[in-house]
Amino acid sequence: MQSLSTPHTISLLLPRTSPSRLSPSLHSLAFPTRLRSLSYSSQTSILPDAGDDFIVGDCLVYEDGVFEDPYLDKEVTQVAKQERKKNRRGGAKRLDESEIEPENLVPEEWRDIQAEVNLTKKDKRKIAQEMEFGVRVEKKRQGLIPLRKVDLNDFLTYKEAKLAQLRPVILDKPGNFSDDSGASSDGETAVSSPSERVAPKNPRWAVYGKGFDHVAKFFNSDKYDPSDKKSDGPRKLLSKEEKFMLNSRNPDLAVATSKKWLPLHTLAACGEFYLVDSLLKHNLDINATDVGGLTVLHRAIIGKKQAITNYLLRESANPFVLDDEGATLMHYAVQTASAPTIKLLLLYNADINAQDRDGWTPLHVAVQARRSDIVKLLLIKGADIEVKNKDGLTPLGLCLYLGREIRTYEVMKLLKEFPLSRHKKRLVTTDEDIE
């Protein structure tokens, strides 16, 4: 049997595990280089040589300081000390440090393409502005370039050639063309030779395509003579009624109108503020109604012309006028959802709870339109939610017939919550008065 104190038996007894890097016991583990064995019965010895390394499991364990070189350590420590001293003094450059200059690896032939690719949008915009400015400067420097000399004879020959190619038919005094039945015996129709341009049949076409300014300029010019009675004169452009109104210098605007649209109504609906002002200076009836029973205020409110509505009310237009169905101006303002017009009519003491012939109030109209903003405005201004129409429906009851939509629920919420909040405010004010 072998002795238990031999290295071979020790390696067999120890477990074969890989050493951990974190375990400090491997660094402190040291084995003697020479071991004395116990006495054997035989003279053989299994001890290894003194210079061999001992195997513990699968690892080789070396002595401390085997791979250390004292001369190399001294040089490294000296260099590190020198670097620390230089860094402390002023941050000098490290040893053996050389600056590397930037080098462009793009060939010279591609440098222009590289510069174009690297341009930003801002640079491109500046270049375009500079180019445009440079073109303008060059044009100003050049000045007016004289046209090339054109020969008049060449132009006339070119014109005649083009006219011969197009073959235009120009008739100023055409004769009476005969029909196919009135052809000559030879089968050829007689065509008069063109001589001059045809005069226009309708003299009104002379001012066709021109505006009011051109017509006014024509009447104010010297060419217009009111005393001229020639058939070919400028007055032929006007009808007899227009000539009479023009000669009277005080036109009757009530005559120059259609049955449905009065001039004042038309201009108010179009938003022509200055023309409305000029017409009212001719003593027109500002409360005149058309065929449908609408006044100028109705037309201005329907067209949402706030400036004209305010102007007409200042010019003493009737804010309490009714149409044929008994609707007030407040009904029309609510129907058009014009909050400024509603506030303006309330300043002129318009009735916010007025009913038409069917018993509808402005609040009914706002609920039917499902405009929560107009409903809220009317409730704030004091609209009554308990007024019923001829069908016995209040504004809240009317909501039940409008379907299940989000806008309908918003209107119902306003109608149910707003009276409660107003009732609470009244209770608070009464409690304060009692105290």
UniProtKB/Swiss-Prot annotation:
SUPFAM superfamilies: Ankyrin repeat. Expressed mainly in chloroplast-containing tissues. Also detected in roots, stems, flower buds, developing siliques and dry seeds. Residues 1-22, 175-199 are annotated as: Disordered. Residues 1-36 form a transit peptide. ANK repeats lie at residues 259-288, 292-321, 325-354, 358-387, 391-424. Residues 11-22 have a biased composition (Low complexity). Pfam families: Ank_2 (PF12796), Ank_4 (PF13637). GO terms for cellular component: chloroplast. Disruption phenotype: Plants show a developmental arrest of the embryos at the globular stage. Induction: By light. Keywords: ANK repeat, Chloroplast, Plastid, Repeat, Transit peptide. InterPro entries: Ankyrin_rpt, Ankyrin_rpt-contain_sf. GO terms for molecular function: molecular condensate scaffold activity. It is found in: Plastid, Chloroplast. Residues 178-195 have a biased composition (Polar residues). It comes from the Eukaryota. Involved in the initial differentiation of the proplastid during the embryo development and in plastid differentiation linked to cell differentiation, morphogenesis and organogenesis during the plant life cycle. Interacts with EMB506. No homodimerization observed. This is Ankyrin repeat domain-containing protein, chloroplastic.
